[in-house]
């Protein structure tokens, strides 16, 4: 599996949260020890988590100054233990130099991936578990280290080196998966001039977007689709958010984009208004085992494309194509 990330913009901090079943109380008796170490050039944030309980969340966020970029720099780490799984991500943005460690323990199987992110070169290449793309098992340790010191354009579908292309195949079991293959395309595009609302709802699923980790980012979706927490902007830019194919879209200059209150409502606090999303259920999926949606978050100088297939007990594991 290859993940190719090209970022154009010095202070764009995406966070993508991806689970199927947060309410699954099956820990499988595993002791998952997690060590997170952020080694940013200007900020060192160390977070060591040893979790063996379901729904154990730990989030550290630091804001640092420094030169070389506009706005604040951020460093965060988080640890989640769900169903015997530790999911940990460290993300440092220190005005141009980033070292990110991504450590997973899925049912006793350890996956280590190291992000090396140089914001000056606007490019990140991330290969995740390129041995066999197999998530269930034990005793396997996969280490992937990728350094990008130039503006490499590696398997990008978009031009100008500001494409985030994330192909991620996962197949693991939990109680509430319901056999759905959750194929999701998340696109963050460079457009902050439109003000558009399309009141459509995809199967009345909840989606959450946060621009600040100072507020509680741990929000939960209705099953079967997992939830997403995305940091869309740094509070200084207009932002457009779109969900397709059954979509809504809006733009806001708010310093904080609030999560959806429920599956039919979102809140834009800069305008102090609630926008109801009508439920058209206009699903473009081929079958009931394939729930697909796109999320577009638009910010100047940042274009992200995330194409993820999270397969359940179906044959949709290879449905990863996104040329937008």
From Swiss-Prot:
Region Disordered: start-end pairs: 1-77, 132-194, 272-324
Domain of life: Eukaryota
Biased composition (Low complexity): 21-64, 279-324
Biased composition (Polar residues): 1-11
The protein, known as: Uncharacterized protein DDB_G0280315
Provenance organism: Dictyostelium discoideum (Social amoeba)
Organism lineage: Eukaryota, Amoebozoa, Evosea, Eumycetozoa, Dictyostelia
